[in-house]
């Protein structure tokens, strides 16, 4: 899957989780917007997949997913799926960072 489809899936799962997840959904939207701006800068500058602010948003989403306490059977079912998608988003983000770093020529 791609990051964009995982973000959409994560938002869907968080919406199903209930209003307790609204704050995390807001953070996820902020992350998606920030990541889009980092990868496709509107001013034509070089992409910046190492943006600390974007990484912080992603960390907050992941932290919420790890700390949530399900209150019912539906939330208990959703939690591992949310954690799985969250982990994929983190892995995909750091794959982009690694690709960026691998593209930097080594000093001679």
What are the residue ranges of the model-derived segments?
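Alpha-helical transmembrane signal-anchor/signal-peptide segments
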Residues: 1-9
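Structured inter-helical modules in multipass membrane proteins
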Residues: 10-101
């Amino acid at each position: 899957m791609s990051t964009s489809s995982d973000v959409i899936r994560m938002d869907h799962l968080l919406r199903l989780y209930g209003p307790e997840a609204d704050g995390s959904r807001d953070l996820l939207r902020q992350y998606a917007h920030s990541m889009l701006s980092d990868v496709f800068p509107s001013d034509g500058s070089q992409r910046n997949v190492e943006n600390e602010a974007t990484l912080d948003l992603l960390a907050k989403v992941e932290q919420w997913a790890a700390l949530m306490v399900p209150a019912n059977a539906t939330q208990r079912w959703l939690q591992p799926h949310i954690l799985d998608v969250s982990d994929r988003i983190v892995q995909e983000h750091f794959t982009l960072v690694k690709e960026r770093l691998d593209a930097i020529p080594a000093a001679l």
